[in-house]
Amino acid sequence: MSIILLTSPGGAPGLTTTALGLALTWPRDVVLVDADPCPGHVIESGYLTGRIPPRPGLIGLATAFRDGADPVQTMWEETIPLPHDSGDRMVRLLSGYGHLGQASLMGAAWSSLASAMIDLGQAGVDVIVDAGRLGPEALPSSLVSRASLIGIVTGSRLRQLAGLSMRAEEVEAMSSATTGTVGLVVVGPGRPYNSREIDRKSTR
């Protein structure tokens, strides 16, 4: 498995927490990419408690790629280590955007970045992408088409499931655009609906 893409239809709790928890417990070396177009630097300010100076992150990579830099080397050099309990694995973070609007500047850089992620996967390093909420702008097609797994993160409350229902066409479009597996990641199942009930309702 190489690229694991996580997104949310909106109103779902814990997308970034889910991505971080997955990275910290992942069985292989892994890079967590913050690709949320509405930046919050939650991991840097929360999990890392602001101990590491800000990095240019994704927008810095876009600039470097346009200047002809090697995608894999540049991506790796831009990551920072994430503390974790298992000393025999590498867990690293690629910081996201510095402010609103920067996501629109990535353009063709996503193709180079997705290729770099595939190359890392072949070298034994998986990539987990926190893509933020589904919104007016579609997720980068280069990521969607090359993802091994796309997880749609949702809660099990009625309001959260309503958000999932409203984004059904976008989820279906992603399913058609990838050869990877697309599935639901339910945060807090059984509150009140369990995973089976949610899956049954979402596939109608």
Where do the language-model regions lie?
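Hydrophobic/aromatic beta-strand patches that form the interior of the parallel beta-sheet core
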Residues: 4, 31-33, 92-94, 149-153, ...
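Walker A/P-loop phosphate-binding motif and the immediately C-terminal alpha-helix
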Residues: 2-39, 44
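Cytoplasmic membrane-interface segments at the C-terminal ends of transmembrane helices
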Residues: 25, 67-68, 173-177
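Structural motif
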Residues: 7-11, 34-37, 96-98, 130-133, ...
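P-loop/Walker-type NTP enzyme "switch/lid" segment
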Residues: 7, 35-119
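Conserved catalytic-core segment of NTP-binding enzymes
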Residues: 112-117, 121-202
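N-terminal cationic-hydrophobic initiation segments that often serve targeting/anchoring roles
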Residues: 23-27, 83-84, 118-121, 172
